Amino acid sequence: MYTNMGYLTSSFIFFFLALVTYTYAATIEVRNNCPYTVWAASTPIGGGRRLDRGQTWVINAPRGTKMARIWGRTNCNFNGAGRGSCQTGDCGGVLHCTGWGKPPNTLAEYALDQFSNLDFWDISLVDGFNIPMTFAPTNPSGGKCHAIHCTANINGECPSPLRVPGGCNNPCTTFGGQQYCCTQGPCGPTKFSRFFKQRCPNAYSYPQDDPTSLFTCPSGSTNYRVVFCP
């Protein structure tokens, strides 16, 4: 009986530790430093949260999370049931997002515990730009594991064809076609993607902009911070 209880206790402890490891593979702190309210959004985990100036939202991302996005929504109005709309980044008219936001929106993207035990992460302007952003490991380890940012005045300098209320849209949404959307094989930069790249060289400016825009950190030992208006 004693042996069985010891086995069960050890099994429970192992299960508990495995569960904690799974649940807290990475902590992502989202902070709003903008002088206005930002309605932060996060998929596939997190949903959404109103962040007034100086407020922070902590997201616990499980191991293996991928195709994940964090972005900010602006000029939103929601009722008590969490339904409404946003000028930029709207995700189907709900506070707690389950799908991606409507462009333009500056994106922090990540995938945890992928190839070679690495986290992959980036800032993307493929969906356009609405809010300045930094995305950084809280414990950088050198190499490709360091802070990146996109803080240029893109909204103020946005080319006329891409200008929309509250942001600077992306050429795929604006014009469509393989040249801008890269949906049918290889593609290269355009004058519009170069506009974004010149101002935010660490960020994706078009879908195949991987060499200068994708960053990695060791899985399981790295936490992250996203800051709006750093």
From Swiss-Prot:
GO BP annotation list: defense response; response to fungus
Keywords per UniProt: Disulfide bond, Glycosidase, Hydrolase, Pathogenesis-related protein, Plant defense, Secreted, Signal, Vacuole
Classification via InterPro entries: Osmotin/thaumatin-like_sf, Thaumatin, Thaumatin_CS
SMART domains per the UniProt record, alphabetical: THN
Enzyme class, broadest EC rank: hydrolase
EC number: 3.2.1.6
Main subcellular localisation: secreted
Signal peptide: 1-25
Subcellular location field: Secreted; Vacuole
GO function term, MF aspect, one: beta-glucanase activity
Annotated Pfam families: Thaumatin
Disulphide connectivity of cysteines: 34-229, 76-86, 91-97, 145-217, 150-200, 158-168, 172-181, 182-187
PANTHER family: OS03G0233200 PROTEIN
Family: Belongs to the thaumatin family.
Main function: Antifungal protein. May bind to beta-glucans and have beta-1,3-D-glucanase activity.
Name the UniProt record assigns to this protein: Osmotin-like protein PR-5x
